[in-house]
């Protein structure tokens, strides 16, 4: 029987199946950070249990960490306690930890692929929504809650009910200036933030196959914003070339065996998806959000929509509420919206290719007066690589702030936040009310749009410069 890639990976990991019960899945890699792990470790301690597979568990500090003055004590007491608790727990339970200042520290969904820990055909979990990022390698990767984190720590398994499958087919070729971020924002605008609910989305088609691994990670990262549990892209030569030689990738004969297995993972000819969606890459242009959820997006050359244009009363009410919060009027040209802060970073767009793309736009230019730009590498390795290429000097010469690795302004859990009423163009993944700080207003954009916006001071693309 023809199977989808998600079905193949799922079946390979079922260790127990009983009628009327969820499947019990084996977990190949467990990623942890300081925010969702403390209660899980405490649960192990109270039950007098050991961590079952420390060798399949890796921890980093990312959500709460400051991105400057990283060797000073963390000012916020809650953040400081969470980081200190992770260090204590990692030492007690034998977990490999990459703390602030470590060369391999960074956002958990950046360092996993970077180290070669993320591989095709794996099951990967983390107490974090954007674990779907790792699906770019053909892994089944999804976020879990704190009680599930403890279950994986104790047993290296997880009881799960099989997901439905959805294919998002993106054919054609992207025009210059249009990126993976624009694809995924267009997908979410088309199917809505609940369109993928209960599904694993497999991204397919010519436009997807032509993307780099880092671009594929951007797309899979935001599957959650489409309501899906996970996102996947079939492994191919691009995947193998990215992984080969990385610290945890198989070596020698084991590499050859791994590649042979990975080649069996793509969806079989004739396999049936529960749902299919189609987009034409030729027709896509830079995309930006105007509202307070990632599905409220339009092409940059469009205008803020009128709530009355929505036939669904729920969507109409959501649009009215969003425009009130964002302080926008229907019919306003997106390019006329002034921006106070530009954030380049996050597990969506904080990798070396993202920094290169933005630096190319900023080279020889200046950040506009009155605009603050934060450039936050997704990991210390990314920061090191950017410095080796001179990208840091380009950012600093343009007037941007060059920071240490971390989640930063993606979420208001660290010192990098918006003030009430401030408006940002952000390469992150969520634009909810208060996401980047209480009263902050967020427009989701690609790195290219972020850089051009920093120069012009209004939402812009490089074509506007």
UniProtKB/Swiss-Prot annotation:
InterPro entries: 3-IsopropMal_deHydase_lsu, Acnase/IPM_dHydase_lsu_aba_1/3, Acoase/IPM_deHydtase_lsu_aba, Aconitase_4Fe-4S_BS, Aconitase_4Fe-4S_dom, IPM_dehydratase_rel_enz, IPMI_cat. Its EC number is 4.2.1.33. Keywords: 4Fe-4S, Amino-acid biosynthesis, Branched-chain amino acid biosynthesis, Iron, Iron-sulfur, Leucine biosynthesis, Lyase, Metal-binding. One of its GO terms (biological process) is L-leucine biosynthetic process. Its cofactor is [4Fe-4S] cluster. It comes from the Bacteria. NCBIfam families: leuC (TIGR00170), PRK05478.1 (NF004016), PRK12466.1 (NF009116). Heterodimer of LeuC and LeuD. This is 3-isopropylmalate dehydratase large subunit.
């Amino acid at each position: 029987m023809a199977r989808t890639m998600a079905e193949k990976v799922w079946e390979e990991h079922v260790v127990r199946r009983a009628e009327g019960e969820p499947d019990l899945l084996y977990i190949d890699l467990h990623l942890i950070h300081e925010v969702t792990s403390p209660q899980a470790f405490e649960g192990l301690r109270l039950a007098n249990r050991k961590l079952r597979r420390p060798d399949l568990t890796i921890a980093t500090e990312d959500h709460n960490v400051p991105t400057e003055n990283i060797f000073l004590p963390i000012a916020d007491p809650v953040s400081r306690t969470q980081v200190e608790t992770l260090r204590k727990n990692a030492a007690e339970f034998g977990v490999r930890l990459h703390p602030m200042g470590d060369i391999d520290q960074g956002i958990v969904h950046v360092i996993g692929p970077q180290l070669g820990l993320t591989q095709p055909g794996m099951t990967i979990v983390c107490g974090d929504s954007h674990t779907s990022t790792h699906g770019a390698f053909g892994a089944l990767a999804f976020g879990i809650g704190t009680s599930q984190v403890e279950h994986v720590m104790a047993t290296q398994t997880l009881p799960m009910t099989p997901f439905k499958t959805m294919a998002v087919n993106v054919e054609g070729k992207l025009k210059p200036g249009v990126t993976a971020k624009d694809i995924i924002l267009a997908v979410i605008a088309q199917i809505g933030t609940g369109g993928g609910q209960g599904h694993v989305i497999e991204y397919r088609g010519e436009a997807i196959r032509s993307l780099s691994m880092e671009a594929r990670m951007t797309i899979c990262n935001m599957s959650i914003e489409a309501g899906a549990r996970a996102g996947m892209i079939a492994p191919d030569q691009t995947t193998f070339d990215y992984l080969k030689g990385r610290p945890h990738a198989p070596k020698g004969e084991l590499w050859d065996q791994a590649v042979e297995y990975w080649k069996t993972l793509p969806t079989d000819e004739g396999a049936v998806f529960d749902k299919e969606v189609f987009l034409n890459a030729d027709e896509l242009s830079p995309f930006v959000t105007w509202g307070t959820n990632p599905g409220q997006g339009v092409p940059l050359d469009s205008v803020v929509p009128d709530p009355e244009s929505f036939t669904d009363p729920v969507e109409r009410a959501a649009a009215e509420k969003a425009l009130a919060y964002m302080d926008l009027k229907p019919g306003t040209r997106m390019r006329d919206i002034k921006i106070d802060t530009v954030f380049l970073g996050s597990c969506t767009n904080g990798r070396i290719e993202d920094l290169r793309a933005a630096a190319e736009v900023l080279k020889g230019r200046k950040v506009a007066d009155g605009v603050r730009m934060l450039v936050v590498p997704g990991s210390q390795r990314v920061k090191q690589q950017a410095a080796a290429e001179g990208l840091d000097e380009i950012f600093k010469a343009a007037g941007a702030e060059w920071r240490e690795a971390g989640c930063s302004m993606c979420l208001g859990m660290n010192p990098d936040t918006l003030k009430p009423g401030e408006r940002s163009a952000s390469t992150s993944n969520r634009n909810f009310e208060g996401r980047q700080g209480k009263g902050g207003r967020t427009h989701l954009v690609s790195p290219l749009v972020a850089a051009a916006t920093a120069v012009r001071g209004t939402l812009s693309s490089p074509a506007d410069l």
